[in-house]
Amino acid sequence: MMTHWPSPAKLNLFLYITGQRADGYHTLQTLFQFLDYGDTLHIEPRHDGEIHLLTPVNGVENEDNLIVRAARLLMKVASESGRLPAGSGADISIEKRLPMGGGLGGGSSNAATVLVALNHLWQCGLSIDELATLGLTLGADVPVFVRGHAAFAEGVGEILTPVNPPEKWYLVAPPGVSLPTPVIFKDPQLPRNTPKRSIDTLLKCEFSNDCEVIARKRFREVDAALSWLLEYAPSRLTGTGACVFAEFDTESCARQVLEQAPEWLNAFVAKGVNLSPLHRELL
C-alpha cells in the first residue's frame, strides 16, 4: 500500500487579470504547469475514525491546516453519501520543501494530495470531478492539483482546459519573503483589465504576469531576485509571488546558472511536467 504521496509545486507560466467581479474576486487567465519537485505527504490509515496531523505548523491550529480541513471534508462528504468505510481515519505527516506564501501552490497541493490519497486509501470511490468540486471549496488552485494535468485556467481559476506546454527546465528562486495574496490584489495599481485572449493566441505570445510589477514595487527582495535571474534567461513571477523563476531548455543550462546564484537566493532546479507527479504515481 502506497504511504508516500507527492505534493508537487506548480508554476503560473503566465497570469493576466482580466476583470473584477461584484463580489471582489478577480477574473484571470493563467497557465498552470507542475514541477517534478515539491512536498511529500506520509499517510497511514487508521481504523478509529480519527485524523491526526503529526507535523503541526507553528502558528497554525491543526484544525485550520488545509491538510486536516481536506481530510475532514472528504470524510464528511463520503460519510453523508454512504461511501465512507466504518472507522476510516489517518495519521498524516509532511516533509515540507515548498515555502509558504511563495506562489508555488504548496498549501493547495497539500490539500489536493490529501483528497486524492484518502479517496484511494479509504476506497470511497469519489470521481475526480467530485474531488475537484470539493477542492474548490478549499481554494481556487486546489482543483488543478486534483485533476493532475497542466491547464489553462479562466474565471477565478476554476475553469480548466487541459493543455500541453513545452516541458522546460526551471531555476526557481524563493526570495525569502512571504507575499500575502491580498497585498497584491488590493493594490490600486494592479492591472485589472487585460484583454481576454484565446488559448492559442496566448500560447504564441511572450508570457508575462500582471502581478509582477506590484510584487517588485512592494518587495525589494522580489525585485532583487528577478533582476538577478533576468541577466541569464527569461524570468517571471509565479502566481502572486513571492517566488520567481527562469526558464531554460536544458537541465545543464539551469544548473550552470544555479552554481552562480548568490547565497541569499535559496534557489533550486526542477523540470516542468504536464502530468502531476501525484497522478504519475497512481498510474
Swiss-Prot record:
Q: Which reaction does it catalyse?
A: 4-CDP-2-C-methyl-D-erythritol + ATP = 4-CDP-2-C-methyl-D-erythritol 2-phosphate + ADP + H(+)
One of its GO biological process terms is: terpenoid biosynthetic process
Q: Which InterPro entries match?
A: GHMP_kinase_C_dom, GHMP_kinase_C_sf, GHMP_kinase_N_dom, IspE, Ribosomal_Su5_D2-typ_SF, Ribsml_uS5_D2-typ_fold_subgr
Which pathway or pathways does this protein act in? Isoprenoid biosynthesis; isopentenyl diphosphate biosynthesis via DXP pathway; isopentenyl diphosphate from 1-deoxy-D-xylulose 5-phosphate: step 3/6
Q: Which residues bind ATP?
A: P99, M100, G101, G102, G103, L104, G105, G106, G107, S108, S109
Q: Where is the active site?
A: K10, D141
Classification via Gene3D superfamilies: 3.30.230.10, GHMP kinase, C-terminal domain
Q: What is its EC number?
A: 2.7.1.148
Q: Which SUPFAM superfamilies match?
A: GHMP Kinase, C-terminal domain, Ribosomal protein S5 domain 2-like
What's a Gene Ontology MF term here?
4-(cytidine 5'-diphospho)-2-C-methyl-D-erythritol kinase activity
- Keywords, alphabetical: ATP-binding, Isoprene biosynthesis, Kinase, Nucleotide-binding, Transferase
- The enzyme's main class, written as a single word, is transferase
Matches recorded under Pfam families: GHMP_kinases_C, GHMP_kinases_N
Tell me the protein family, please.
Belongs to the GHMP kinase family. IspE subfamily.
Functionally, this protein is described as follows: Catalyzes the phosphorylation of the position 2 hydroxy group of 4-diphosphocytidyl-2C-methyl-D-erythritol.
Q: How does it assemble?
A: Homodimer.
Name assigned to this protein: 4-diphosphocytidyl-2-C-methyl-D-erythritol kinase
Organism for this UniProt entry: Salmonella choleraesuis (strain SC-B67)
What gene is this protein a product of?
ispE
